[in-house]
Amino acid sequence: MSEFAARLIRWQKTQGRHDLPWQRTRDPYRVWLSEIMLQQTQVATVTPYYLRFLERLPTLADLAAAPTEEVMSLWSGLGYYARARNLHACARAVVERHGGAFPQEPAAIAALPGIGRSTANAIADFCFEAREPILDGNVKRVLCRCFGIEGFPGAPAVEKRLWSLAADLLPDSEVGAYIQAQMDLGATLCTRTKPRCDACPLAEQCVARREGRTEELPQAKPRRALPEREAIFLVVRDGERVLLEQRPPQGIWGGLLSLPELPEGADPARHAESLGCEVLSVARLPPLVHAFTHFRLTLKPVLVEAKALPHAAEVGLRWLALSEIESAALPTPIRKVLQEL
């Protein structure tokens, strides 16, 4: 066993995290759910979503059988909604292809929708006693700093080198503890900013610490200015309820409920009338800016006071009581707009 692995395992046993809800099980459904939720989302945010999700959908079969809207509602607020759509598709694929039993081989797990190599390996390691390296964001940061790896970790050549290094460092025993130690170290000590090098078990061999480069490594992705987009959304209100539509499965907020988006160049009042509304008044609300990974969106909501739409379901729309905003499957910026009403 390498000194790197030995130090990490010793540290994990005494200083690592042992009380997270997904650490108390080897059920691949629950481990997989935690791995997907933890992608680009911190533990403190994930934990209540994880527990609530399992309370409603305690088994993979429950998830596979659930309506899409229920899954999206449970995910609402976590962001990166493609994860929820892939999660649902993956559960159905396990039922259809594997009789409802999660496959045990990493390659078979990675062939499922929304599961990449690192997530597949983590599931196999924690649930089926496999011996496979992982390479999530925390592990990349630890390896880049400890071994002085140059370049952006997401670049193909750098990522290939990191996979090779991760495989070479993998111990022959206590793989689960080692994998957990890497993730714990990156999440608690070897953080993106202000790492706690004084408490790190790898401090003596860490290149970044020795050279004073912990803020520099791993190197960031070359930044580009985010493109700017605008969209006008109709807030059609009839008393204490608002009119919503379901977004198409693909694209931003796919599958979620949202305010009707106004086609480019369309007049808000006329568009509301085309939906069957009797328009009483129209007023513009304050804009809201929301940053996505690849662009910034300025939402320009327009409040349309109207009388009830008689046949909303016939045109793909539905009414939602304002009292149900918090529990509905709404994108965060749309929920913020409605909370201001």
Task: Please tell me what each predicted stretch does.
Residues 1-18, 23-24, 187-341:
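Intrinsically disordered, low-complexity, charged terminal extensions of DNA damage-control enzymes
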Residues 2-215, 226-228, 277-278:
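Catalytic cores of DNA base-excision repair glycosylases
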